[in-house]
Swiss-Prot record:
Natural source organism: Staphylococcus saprophyticus subsp. saprophyticus (strain ATCC 15305 / DSM 20229 / NCIMB 8711 / NCTC 7292 / S-41)
Family from the record: Belongs to the Thz kinase family.
Enzymatic reactions: 5-(2-hydroxyethyl)-4-methylthiazole + ATP = 4-methyl-5-(2-phosphooxyethyl)-thiazole + ADP + H(+)
InterPro entries reported in the protein's UniProt record: Hyethyz_kinase, Ribokinase-like
Entry GO MF terms: ATP binding; hydroxyethylthiazole kinase activity; magnesium ion binding
Protein name: Hydroxyethylthiazole kinase
Enzyme class: transferase
Pfam families: HK
Binding residues for ATP: K115, T160
Length: 263
């Protein structure tokens, strides 16, 4: 399935309720890829924004009490008009406050995809799980966490890390592309959530092939950016990642993706 070319032909509108740290980078990343971002946070305009939209991204990176009801109202409106939701529970394991909100959110709203690192996804299904800020525990078994989260949360799950894990309809793939520099740029994971949202179809059930393609395209772009950055570091890499998202092609995905099905 060539979802990337379809994306660039149709310029899908992605409504982003995302955190304050990453709005600019997320918007520029989506524009570079070929999507159309709108950074909307007002429930008063939700129905107008979401009716023509292809997807909604909800990212709780800078969650506050004042924003809780707005997030819930916007997400419920997306459900009402049939706009698919990607949920990014940033640092959910770092505080009980975030765990409680995510539990309320997932009990109230239907989401198509939940994306996070292994520690974040574990915290959604295990209230005792802990995190240090947004950092993930590399010793966790991402595949087993993804399986359990998929079963309990009834959503596609994408776990990011050195290798990424994607599960949908009980099919599981491990994706081995990517760059270590992604972990050195604030907002790189948040941008991936928006990229995944831009690949979601509005008129059919999201397939695992679309989720695998979206995640792999992003990671292949990151590999290209790292090569071009040479040894210059994260600042150069961040700018080159936007260029790489603009330049990456479906042929790159076909020829360079490193994907393993997990039995």
């Amino acid at each position: 399935m060539n979802s990337l070319n379809n994306l660039r032909t149709n310029n899908p509108l992605v409504i982003c309720y995302t955190n304050d740290v990453v709005k600019n980078f997320t918007a520029n990343g989506l524009l570079s890829l070929g999507a159309s971002p709108a950074m909307s946070q007002a429930p008063e305009e939700a129905i107008d924004m979401l009716t023509p939209a292809n997807a909604l991204l909800i990212n709780i990176g800078t969650l506050t009490k004042d924003r809780e009801q707005d997030i819930l109202e916007i997400a419920k409106t997306a459900n009402e008009v049939g706009t698919p939701i990607v949920f990014d529970p940033v640092a959910v394991g770092a505080s009980q406050y975030r765990k409680d909100f995510c539990k309320t959110f997932l009990n109230t709203v239907d989401v198509v995809v939940i994306k996070g690192n292994a520690s974040e996804i574990l915290a959604l299904i295990n209230n005792d799980a802990k995190m240090k800020g947004t950092d993930s525990d590399d010793n966790l078994n991402a595949i087993e966490i993804a399986k359990e989260a998929h079963k309990r949360l009834n959503s596609a799950i994408i776990i990011t890390g050195k290798e990424d894990v994607v599960i949908q309809d009980n099919q599981i793939y491990q994706l081995n592309n990517g760059s270590a520099l992604l972990a050195k740029v604030t907002g790189a994971g948040c941008l991936l959530g928006a990229v995944i949202a831009s690949f979601l179809p509005t008129d059919e059930t999201t397939s695992i092939s679309q989720l695998v393609e979206a995640t792999s395209i992003y990671n292949i772009a990151a590999e290209k950016a790292e090569q071009l950055a040479e040894d210059k570091g994260p600042g150069t890499f961040m700018t080159l990642l936007l260029d790489a998202l603009y330049q990456v092609t479906y042929d790159d995905y076909s020829n360079q993706s490193d994907i393993q099905e997990v039995q």
